[in-house]
Design a protein with these regions (language model features):
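NAD(P)H-binding glycine-rich loop region in Rossmannoid oxidoreductase-like domains
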Residues: 43-83
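N-terminal Rossmann NAD(P)H-binding glycine-rich loop of SDR-like oxidoreductase domains
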Residues: 2-23
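Mid/C-terminal beta-alpha module of Rossmann-like enzyme folds, strongest
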Residues: 197, 204-249, 254-255
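Conserved C-terminal active-site "lid" loop/helix of NAD(P)H-dependent oxidoreductases
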Residues: 219-225, 242-286
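NAD(P)-cofactor binding segment of oxidoreductase domains
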Residues: 75-100, 135
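Rossmann-fold cofactor-recognition segment
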Residues: 32-47
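NAD(P)-dependent short-chain dehydrogenase/reductase
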Residues: 136-186, 193, 199
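Conserved Rossmann-fold NAD(P)-dependent oxidoreductase catalytic core, especially the SDR/UDP-sugar
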Residues: 89-122
Length: 287
């Protein structure tokens, strides 16, 4: 049985990946704060990474550890680079196995989305630039790598910060009005859906750059409306606004989203509809 070192195991994607991968691999789950039998690992520390790699000797590294707060990245670019680029470099130092790196649609400028793997990158935020630098490091290295770009991840977990899905559901259940942007377009992606794809990549030793996102390009307001519809909540509480009204520090790609033709043609994998994934979450909550 192959061994996987999983970083960022405490995040919303990490929790789900841990569950899926444990059935097929020997998984060593790590996080910056050691909880629930996970091992302590700060990927920004070269010594810490070296010690863990020597002890675990993994065949595969699944790197989910990152600084993903887009506005904080903009305010603290040094820290963003420390985790989003230098952390990956530390993981690769002396490692000769398969590294799986999660990336983002924020490597694009959001002017002409949705994008495929051959489209030119042009990040407009520190977060996007640091994630692109990480991609470029892997592509120019001699490592066996898989880069998976995704967007607008959502799911359910008790162990991580509430996702967009949980926030919308909880707000509407509490009869709270919420303001959602109507001018940012993506195809929202279920953590369950992405975790299954990652399992496939790890199991088949598939290398390269791939886009993975669920099927259904929509703006955030439409996504919130769809959540309200699927979970039978009061959608009149959802108010559409423009991104400019939020006065956010970092710029966001407006017309983004990811095309998945490459994985469909090369790997025979077709992502599910966004609504299908939401219905699965509703069923899961009822059980």
């Amino acid at each position: 049985m192959k061994t996987i070192l999983l970083t960022g195991a405490y995040g919303q994607l990490g929790v789900v990946c841990e569950e899926y991968l444990n059935k097929h691999f020997k998984v060593y789950s790590t996080a910056r704060t050691a909880k629930n039998k996970r091992f302590l690992l700060d990927i920004s520390s070269r010594q810490s990474v070296k010690r863990v790699l020597e002890n675990v000797q993994p065949d595969i590294i699944l790197n989910l550890a990152a600084m993903t707060d887009v506005d904080r990245c903009e305010s603290e670019p040094g820290i963003a680079k420390k985790y989003n680029l230098n952390g990956l470099i530390n993981l690769c130092d002396g490692f000769d196995g398969h590294i799986i790196q999660i990336s983002t649609d924020y490597v694009f400028d959001g002017k002409k989305g949705p994008y495929d793997e051959n489209d030119s990158t042009n990040p407009i935020s520190v977060y996007g630039r640091t994630k692109l630098l990480a991609e470029e490091f892997l592509i120019n290295s001699n490592h066996n790598y898989t880069i998976i770009r995704t967007n607008v991840l959502y799911g359910f977990t008790d162990n991580a910060k509430a996702s967009f899905l949980q926030w919308v559901i909880n707000s509407l259940k509490d009869s709270k009005s919420i303001r959602i942007v109507k001018d940012q377009w993506n195809n929202p992606t279920s953590t369950n859906s992405l975790a299954k794809f990652i399992l496939n990549i790890a199991s088949t030793s598939t290398y390269g750059l791939y886009h993975y996102a669920d099927e259904g390009l929509m703006n955030r307001y439409e996504f919130a409306q769809l959540i309200g519809k699927v979970f039978h909540l009061d959608r009149s509480l959802i108010q559409p606004i423009l991104t400019s009204e939020l006065n956010q520090i970092a710029s966001r790609p407006m017309l983004s989203g990811l095309k998945t033709r490459k994985i469909e043609e090369e790997l025979g994998i077709k992502p599910p509809l966004v609504e299908t994934c939401l219905l699965e979450f509703r069923k899961m909550l009822k059980s």
